[in-house]
From Swiss-Prot:
Record-linked NCBIfam families: lipoamide_DH
Oligomeric and partner information: Homodimer.
Name of the protein this chain belongs to: Dihydrolipoyl dehydrogenase
SUPFAM superfamilies from the UniProt entry: FAD/NAD(P)-binding domain (SSF51905), FAD/NAD-linked reductases, dimerisation (C-terminal) domain (SSF55424)
Result of changing residue 376 to D: In allele 1 and allele 2
Disulfide-bonded cysteines: 50-55
Additional remarks: The active site is a redox-active disulfide bond.
Organism lineage: Eukaryota, Discoba, Euglenozoa, Kinetoplastea, Metakinetoplastina
Native organism: Trypanosoma cruzi
Keyword Signal found: no
PANTHER family linked: DIHYDROLIPOYL DEHYDROGENASE, MITOCHONDRIAL (PTHR22912:SF151), DISULFIDE OXIDOREDUCTASE (PTHR22912)
UniProt keyword terms in alphabetical order: Disulfide bond, FAD, Flavoprotein, NAD, Oxidoreductase, Redox-active center
Biological processes, Gene Ontology terms: 2-oxoglutarate metabolic process
Length: 477
C-alpha cells in the first residue's frame, strides 16, 4: 500500500523518464543549460542497459576472455612461455565486471549531484502531459508538474514465444553476462552484435558455440566484406560454428539443456541440443507502465514512439530519444547525441544529430567498425563510387605486434571524392573509426585524409593508406 501521494506544485522545466545513456546525458545537459531538471529511473542505478547489463559489462568480459585466450593461443609466439597453463576464475572475472559497473554508475550519480539534477529512484508515468507520477522503490508515491518531458526508457530483449527467458538455460544478454560456469555447448540465436560478442566470450573460455542466423550472413546490415572477414576469423580462431539461412521453428527447455529445432534453406530440419541458449533476436522499445496511451502518444506498428525532426512526439511538450524512438539505430552513443541535441532544443538552441554518421562497432577479436554507407547500399541506391582498401598485414604496427588480420575499406563518391563510408576490421577498429566519423562529419574527401600526416608506426596509417589508394597509389602495399 502506497502512502498518500505528495504533489509538488513548483514545476520542473524538464523531467526525463529513464536514466540510461540518452536519459542521463539529456538530464545533465538540460541542467547545464539552466533548466530545473529531474530524472526518474526505476532500475535503482543510473546508466540503463548499457552501463548495467550491456555495453560495459560485456566489454569487461570480452577483455578478460581475450587475455585468457591470447595466453593459451599466442603467448608462445611472443616468446612468453607457460601461457597454456593460465587458468580462469569465473567468480573473480565476474567481480571485476561488477567493480567496473559499480564505479561507473556511481560516477553518473555524482554527475547528477554536481549538475544539480534531482534523481528519483522509481517508476515514472504520465498522469497528464504535464504531470508525472513516481512509484518510488522505497514505497513512496509522488507526483509533480513539469513544463516538458523527455521519454528515454530504452529497450528490452525480445524473447521467443515458445522459449521464454529463465536466465538459467534460456538466456537474454543479461543472463549470458552472468553465467556462473562455462557451458560445454551454447547456441546463439541471432548473429548480430550481441550474439557475436557474447558467443565469443564463452567460446574463448571453452564452450562449443554455434550461431544460428536467419539471414544469409551474420551482421547483415554491415558491409559484406567486413562480415565475411569477421566470421572467418571467429571460425578459425575461436572455433565458432555458423548456421546461416537457418530459422528456428521450435524448441524445448529441458531444465538443464535446450533442444532446438532448426530448418535450413533447403527445408531440411534437425535438432540441436545445448546446455545454454542465448536468444539475441533483437530488442523492442520499453514503454510498459508509462501511461503513453493515457495521454495519446503516437507509436508505430512495432511500438516505437513516433518523433519529428526535433524529437517531439504527437503530444505538445512531450519528447522522446534513444532506443524507444522510431529513428536511427538502437545504440548508446546515438542516444547520447540525441540527449544533448534534445536538451539544446528545449533550451531554445539549435540541436542536431547527423544520423548518417553514427558508427557501429562489434567488439570481437578482431573488432569490426563501420560508419556511413556499405558497398551494398551504394549499389542499391545507384551511387557511382570508388573503393580504396589497405590490409593490416602491410601495416608496420600490426606486423610488430602480430595482429595482422583485417583491412580498412573506404568508399567515396566517384565524382567528388567525398567519403561515403568507412569499414574497418582489426584489433582496434573501434578506436580507429572515430577519425573516419570526424572526416565524414566535416565532408572530407579521401585526399584530405590521405594527405594528413599520421604517426608512425600506428594502426591509423592503414586508414591513410586506404584513402591514398583512391587518389594515387598506396606506398606500403
Amino acid at each position: 500500500m502506497f502512502r498518500r501521494c505528495a504533489v509538488k506544485l513548483n514545476p520542473y522545466d524538464v523531467v526525463v523518464i529513464g536514466g540510461g545513456p540518452g536519459g542521463y546525458v539529456a538530464s545533465i545537459k538540460a541542467a547545464q543549460l539552466g533548466m530545473k531538471t529531474a530524472c526518474v529511473e526505476k532500475r535503482g542505478a543510473l546508466g540503463g542497459t548499457c552501463l548495467n547489463v550491456g555495453c560495459i559489462p560485456s566489454k569487461a568480459l570480452l577483455h578478460a576472455t581475450h587475455v585468457y585466450h591470447d595466453a593459451h593461443a599466442n603467448f608462445a609466439r611472443y616468446g612468453l612461455m607457460g601461457g597454456e597453463g593460465v587458468t580462469m576464475d569465473s567468480a573473480k572475472m565476474q567481480q571485476q565486471k561488477e567493480r567496473a559497473v559499480k564505479g561507473l554508475t556511481g560516477g553518473v550519480e555524482y554527475l547528477f549531484k554536481k549538475n544539480k539534477v534531482t534523481y528519483y529512484k522509481g517508476e515514472g508515468s504520465f498522469e497528464t502531459a504535464h504531470s508525472i507520477r513516481v512509484n518510488g522503490l522505497d514505497g513512496k508515491q509522488e507526483m509533480f508538474e513539469t513544463k516538458k518531458t523527455i521519454i528515454a526508457t530504452g529497450s528490452e530483449p525480445t524473447e521467443l514465444p515458445f522459449l521464454p527467458f529463465d536466465e538459467k538455460v534460456v538466456l537474454s544478454s543479461t543472463g549470458a553476462l552472468a553465467l556462473p560456469r562455462v557451458p560445454k555447448t551454447m547456441v546463439v540465436i541471432g548473429g548480430g552484435v550481441i550474439g557475436l560478442e557474447l558467443g565469443s566470450v564463452w567460446a574463448r573460455l571453452g564452450a562449443k558455440v554455434t550461431v544460428v542466423e536467419f539471414a544469409p550472413r551474420c551482421a547483415p546490415t554491415l558491409d559484406e566484406d567486413v562480415t565475411n572477414a569477421l566470421v572467418g576469423a571467429l571460425a578459425k580462431n575461436e572455433k565458432m560454428k555458423f548456421m546461416t539461412s537457418t530459422k528456428v521453428v521450435g524448441g524445448t527447455n529441458n531444465g538443464d539443456s535446450v533442444s532446438l529445432e532448426v530448418e535450413g534453406k533447403n527445408g531440411k530440419r534437425e535438432t540441436v541440443t545445448c546446455e545454454a541458449l542465448l536468444v539475441s533476436v533483437g530488442r523492442r522499445p520499453f514503454t510498459g507502465g508509462l501511461g503513453l496511451d493515457k495521454i495519446n502518444v503516437a507509436k508505430n506498428e512495432r511500438g516505437f514512439v513516433k518523433i519529428g525532426d526535433h524529437f517531439e512526439t504527437s503530444i505538445p511538450d512531450v519528447y522522446a530519444i534513444g532506443d524507444v524512438v522510431d529513428k536511427g539505430p538502437m545504440l548508446a552513443h546515438k542516444a547520447e547525441d540525441e540527449g544533448v541535441a534534445c536538451a539544446e532544443i528545449l533550451a531554445g538552441k539549435p540541436g542536431h544529430v547527423n544520423y548518417g554518421v553514427i558508427p557501429a562497432v562489434i567488439y570481437t577479436m578482431p573488432e569490426v567498425a563501420s560508419v556511413g554507407k556499405s558497398e551494398e547500399e551504394l549499389k542499391k541506391e545507384g551511387v557511382a563510387y570508388k573503393v580504396g582498401k589497405f590490409p593490416f598485414n602491410a601495416n608496420s604496427r600490426a606486423k610488430a605486434v602480430s595482429t595482422e588480420d583485417g583491412f580498412v575499406k573506404v568508399l567515396v563518391d566517384k565524382a567528388t571524392d567525398r567519403i561515403l563510408g568507412v569499414h574497418i576490421v582489426c584489433t582496434t577498429a573501434g578506436e580507429l573509426i572515430g577519425e573516419a566519423c570526424l572526416a565524414m562529419e566535416y565532408g572530407a574527401s579521401s585526399e584530405d585524409v590521405g594527405r594528413t600526416c599520421h604517426a608512425h608506426p600506428t594502426m591509423s596509417e592503414a586508414l591513410k593508406e586506404a584513402c591514398m589508394a583512391l587518389v594515387a597509389k598506396t606506398i606500403n602495399f
